[in-house]
Swiss-Prot record:
Active site positions, chain numbering: D155
Domain PABS: 2-235
Pathway noted in the entry: Amine and polyamine biosynthesis; spermidine biosynthesis; spermidine from putrescine: step 1/1
Primary localisation category: cytoplasm
InterPro entries documented for this protein: PABS, PABS_CS, SAM-dependent_MTases_sf, Spermi_synthase, Spermidine_synt_N, Spermidine_synt_N_sf
Binding sites annotated in the UniProt record for spermidine: H60, D84
Annotated S-methyl-5'-thioadenosine binding sites: Q29, E104, D136, G137, P162
One term under GO cellular component: cytosol
Organism superkingdom: Bacteria
Compartment annotation: Cytoplasm
Organism encoding this protein: Parasynechococcus marenigrum (strain WH8102)
Reaction(s) catalysed by this chain's protein: S-adenosyl 3-(methylsulfanyl)propylamine + putrescine = S-methyl-5'-thioadenosine + spermidine + H(+)
Biological role: Catalyzes the irreversible transfer of a propylamine group from the amino donor S-adenosylmethioninamine (decarboxy-AdoMet) to putrescine (1,4-diaminobutane) to yield spermidine.
Protein name, per record: Polyamine aminopropyltransferase
């Protein structure tokens, strides 16, 4: 392997030993594809780790299954971001999903993922239920009809560059508007250690917009601090805390990280310093 490939954040480096296979700049960001000794091929955007073949389930399972196992219906799903295909792949494991809109702003992320990381997207790209749109997910949410989706998932990068607008009130209000009754919204919500201020602000804002929102904590070892979060929100009570057993039974055996038991523990694993900051 050629050397160390590092992500730098606030005076700390997070690195993998490996080789750079592709490095290019799209109209939106710098994209790198690497081959690492530890986690296989991986993707970086603007120098930040996004995903890798042997790590992606830590992230994708945590984002998808608490939402799809708890929403009242899951026929129509919107995924904003997620150009590697991993989030859509986990969603399409549910036969109840009839239509999934995958809206990714950077077409090169999709193309490079299909070429170099085909195992992450799997059969998504040929599944007739998945409609890929290369475009702005923020504009998509703003223009979508009221109550048009059962589940809305935001699989974006950190709050900078093209993903910055995925973290503000106007966007979250549109996500609430397009969610059907009984629906669930979910988003990656940064690290409570490496991005503490952003994380706390996101959870507070989602509670204001939706009425009910709670973070779930897990680990993604290649991300800053290794400790990550996903926040789930709903209008009609914290339904994301109640797993539907029949749906869970369909997917649990194929999961490496998620299970109903893991989900319960991860939702309850709020550290004291975060609980104090989130207290009314």
């Amino acid at each position: 392997m050629g050397g160390w490939i590092d992500e730098e954040h606030r005076g700390v480096r997070y690195g993998l030993a490996g080789d750079v296979l592709v490095e290019e700049t799209s109209p939106f960001q710098r994209i790198s594809v690497i081959r690492s000794e530890r986690y296989g091929k991986g993707l970086l955007l603007d120098g930040c780790w996004m995903t890798a073949e042997q790590q992606e389930r830590h992230y994708h399972e945590a984002l998808v299954h608490p939402a799809l196992c708890s929403a009242e219906a899951i026929e129509r799903v919107l995924v904003i971001g997620g150009g590697d295909g991993g989030t859509a792949r986990e969603c399409l494991r549910y036969p109840e999903v009839i239509h999934l809109d995958l809206v990714e702003i950077d077409g090169r992320v999709v193309e490079l993922s299909q070429e170099h990381l085909p195992g992450i997207g799997g059969a998504v790209w040929s599944d007739s239920r998945c409609q890929l749109t290369v475009g702005d997910g923020i504009a998509w949410a703003a223009n979508a009809p009221d109550q048009s989706y059962d589940v809305v998932l935001v699989d974006g990068s950190d709050p900078a560059g093209p993903a910055e607008g995925l973290f503000n009130r106007a966007f979250f209000e549109h996500c609430r508007r397009i969610l059907k009754p009984g629906g669930v919204f979910a988003t990656q919500s940064e690290s409570p250690e490496a991005f503490r201020e952003v994380h706390v602000a996101m959870v507070r804002l989602l509670r204001e917009v939706f009425g009910h929102a709670d973070p779930l904590y897990g680990w993604v070892p290649m991300y800053p601090s290794g400790w990550w979060s996903w926040t789930f929100a709903a209008v009609d009570g914290p339904r994301y805390r109640t797993v539907q057993p029949a749906r869970a039974a369909l997917v649990a055996e194929g999961c490496e990280i998620w299970s109903p038991r893991w989900q319960q523990g991860a939702l309850d694993a709020v550290p004291a310093f975060i609980a104090r900051e989130l207290a009314p």
